[in-house]
């Protein structure tokens, strides 16, 4: 199983040649190049190199492209293979050949080419790449349903500019009102989503991108351990994240902060004038 292959296809007619080439989908390729050659015997053939986004077995290649082409796992660099394929006539080229030692390749591209290799060499980076990929897939497929009355009220509140004090508290004691569904929908718009937790854990995660709007989606089981401290620190836009990589953050940009909860806020632990309460 590999991503990079060389192939040769002997053909007799233009239709046969074009039919084979039409089987390559640009969405599946990192890089693709193919040239047209004529052997000393007069036999016309395609000489190509392809770098797929995902690994594929030889059996998979034959299933997709048929049995007539000859396939081999590629050796050498993309550029070396390109030179070999273009000795006579270049027919098609998709993408840019990757140079060994080039810094142009993004970390995500390297991860997608071989996740297992990155996991062995740099597990922390691999974990972050996987999380980013999963989030992108989640955001692209999540389908929100028709808004309920309280969700329309919340949406209207979010259309206003955020201030430096208000915390929007969405409260519904029964459950099943759509609080978590709305909170998850906000992820698609770049919001920071958290279920709460220890103050420094929350601050550390938020500090990775400290200009995001914030959604606390508090599980019912955590209602008695509501972290008002973290909520106020994030809303105040000045805090210290001391976990792993200590940093003091002073942020000018104001953000919305929403708490989705099964309980009403405790007035002994947070100033009532901060609160904008929306009942489900």
UniProtKB/Swiss-Prot annotation:
Organism: Subterranean clover stunt C2 alphasatellite
Motif RCR-1 location, chain numbering: 6-9
Name this protein carries in UniProt: Para-Rep C2
Cofactor note: Divalent metal cations, possibly Mg(2+) or Mn(2+).
The entry's keywords: ATP-binding, Covalent protein-DNA linkage, DNA replication, DNA-binding, Endonuclease, Helicase, Host nucleus, Hydrolase, Metal-binding, Multifunctional enzyme, Nuclease, Nucleotide-binding, Nucleotidyltransferase, Transferase
Record-listed ATP binding positions: 172-180
Family, as annotated: Belongs to the nanoviridea/circoviridae replication-associated protein family.
One Gene Ontology term, aspect cellular component: host cell nucleus
Free-text comment on this protein's domains from its UniProt entry: There are 3 rolling circle replication (RCR) motifs. RCR-2 is probably involved in metal coordination. RCR-3 is required for phosphodiester bond cleavage for initiation of RCR.
More details: The genome of nanoviruses is composed of six to eight segments. In addition, some isolates contain subviral DNAs.
Motif stretch (RCR-2): 45-47
Protein localization: Host nucleus
GO MF, one annotated term: RNA binding
Cofactor: Mg(2+); Mn(2+)
Motif (RCR-3): 84-87
Gene Ontology annotations of biological process type: DNA replication
Lineage, top ranks: Viruses, Viruses incertae sedis, Alphasatellitidae, Nanoalphasatellitinae
Function: Initiates and terminates the replication only of its own subviral DNA molecule. The closed circular ssDNA genome is first converted to a superhelical dsDNA. Rep binds a specific hairpin at the genome origin of replication. Introduces an endonucleolytic nick within the intergenic region of the genome, thereby initiating the rolling circle replication (RCR). Following cleavage, binds covalently to the 5'-phosphate of DNA as a tyrosyl ester. The cleavage gives rise to a free 3'-OH that serves as a primer for the cellular DNA polymerase.
Subunit structure: Homooligomer (Potential). Rep binds to repeated DNA motifs (iterons).
Span of the annotated motif Nuclear localization signal: 54-75, 97-103
Source organism superkingdom: Viruses
Active site: 84
Reactions mediated catalytically: ATP + H2O = ADP + phosphate + H(+)
Binding residue positions for a divalent metal cation: 37, 45
EC number of this enzyme: 2.7.7.-, 3.1.21.-, 3.6.1.-
Record-annotated CRESS-DNA virus Rep endonuclease domain positions: 1-97
């Amino acid at each position: 199983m590999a991503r990079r292959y060389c192939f040769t296809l002997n053909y007799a007619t233009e239709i046969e040649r074009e039919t084979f080439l039409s089987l390559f989908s640009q969405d599946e390729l990192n890089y693709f190049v193919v040239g047209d050659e004529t052997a000393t015997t007069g036999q016309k053939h395609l000489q190509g190199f392809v770098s797929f986004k995902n690994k594929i077995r030889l059996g998979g290649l034959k299933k997709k492209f048929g049995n007539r082409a000859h396939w081999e796992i590629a050796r050498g660099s993309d550029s070396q293979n390109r030179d070999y394929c273009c000795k006579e006539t270049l027919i098609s080229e998709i993408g840019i050949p990757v140079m060994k030692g080039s810094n142009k390749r993004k970390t995500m591209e390297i991860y997608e080419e071989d996740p297992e290799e990155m996991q062995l060499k740099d597990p922390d980076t691999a974990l972050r790449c996987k999380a980013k990929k999963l989030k992108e897939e989640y955001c692209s497929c999540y389908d929100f349903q028709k808004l309920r009355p309280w969700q329309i009220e919340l949406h209207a509140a979010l259309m206003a500019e955020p201030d430096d004090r208000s915390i929007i508290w969405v409260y519904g004691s029964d459950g099943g009102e759509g609080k978590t569904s709305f909170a998850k929908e906000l992820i698609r718009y770049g919001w920071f989503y958290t279920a709460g937790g220890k103050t420094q854990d929350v601050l550390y995660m938020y500090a990775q991108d400290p200009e995001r709007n914030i959604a606390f989606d508090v599980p019912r089981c955590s209602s008695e351990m509501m972290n008002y401290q973290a909520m106020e620190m994030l809303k105040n836009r000045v805090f210290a994240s001391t976990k792993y990589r200590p940093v003091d953050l002073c942020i000018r940009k104001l953000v919305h902060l929403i708490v989705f909860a099964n309980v009403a806020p405790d007035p002994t632990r947070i100033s009532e004038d901060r609160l904008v309460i929306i009942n489900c």
